[in-house]
């Protein structure tokens, strides 16, 4: 069993006065966050038994067994929620968890090093890779599409990119 943790959501704050919380889910099917319970904090010191109550704009109202007041709920604002990788579903060959992409070397189609993946962001229309250029603080943004990133090789720790004109 793998001890690797994946961030599946975050606590956005209290909802009401009875200890309910606003939860943001980062799961492909947002409701699935409940099935990975108990979730942990990033350091693994806190465990949360999550039960979704109802959907709201931008997430869910949830109850956590360990939280019974607004003050306790407020204290958890910003806590990221993690599940063990083994709890998550296997992905098809052409899909990746963001955490697997971060740190990969990015090469252009000619084999030149463009940098490494710093972050992956979902901007609604699609995922964007932020690539840290080597030896500088400069970053470039690349759409994470098959046209721009035709090859991802997790075992080799790299991906091949064909940046759009003007991206560099």
From Swiss-Prot:
Residues 93-167 form the PRC barrel domain. Binds ribosomal protein uS19. It is found in: Cytoplasm. Its main location: cytoplasm. Gene3D superfamilies: PRC-barrel domain (2.30.30.240), RimM (2.40.30.60). An accessory protein needed during the final step in the assembly of 30S ribosomal subunit, possibly for assembly of the head region. Essential for efficient processing of 16S rRNA. May be needed both before and after RbfA during the maturation of 16S rRNA. It has affinity for free ribosomal 30S subunits but not for 70S ribosomes. The PRC barrel domain binds ribosomal protein uS19. It holds the Pfam family PRC_RimM. Belongs to the RimM family. Transmembrane segments: none annotated. Keywords: Chaperone, Cytoplasm, Ribosome biogenesis, rRNA processing. It comes from the Bacteria. This is Ribosome maturation factor RimM.
């Amino acid at each position: 069993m793998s001890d690797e943790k994946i961030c599946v959501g975050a606590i956005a704050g209290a909802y009401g006065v009875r200890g309910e919380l606003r939860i943001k889910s980062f799961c492909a099917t947002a409701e699935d966050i409940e099935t990975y319970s108990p979730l942990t904090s990033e350091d693994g010191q806190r465990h949360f038994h999550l039960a979704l109550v109802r959907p709201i704009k931008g997430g869910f109202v949830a109850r956590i067994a360990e939280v019974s007041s607004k003050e306790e709920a407020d204290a958890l604002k910003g806590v990221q929620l993690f599940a063990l990788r083994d709890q998550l579903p296997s992905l098809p060959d052409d899909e990746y968890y963001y955490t697997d992409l971060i740190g990969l070397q990015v090469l252009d189609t000619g084999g030149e090093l463009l940098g490494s993946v710093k972050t992956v962001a979902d901007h609604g229309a699609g995922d964007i890779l932020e690539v840290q250029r080597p030896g500088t603080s400069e970053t470039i943004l690349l759409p994470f599409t098959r046209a721009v990133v035709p090859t991802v090789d997790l075992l080799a720790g790299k991906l091949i990119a064909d940046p759009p004109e003007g991206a560099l």
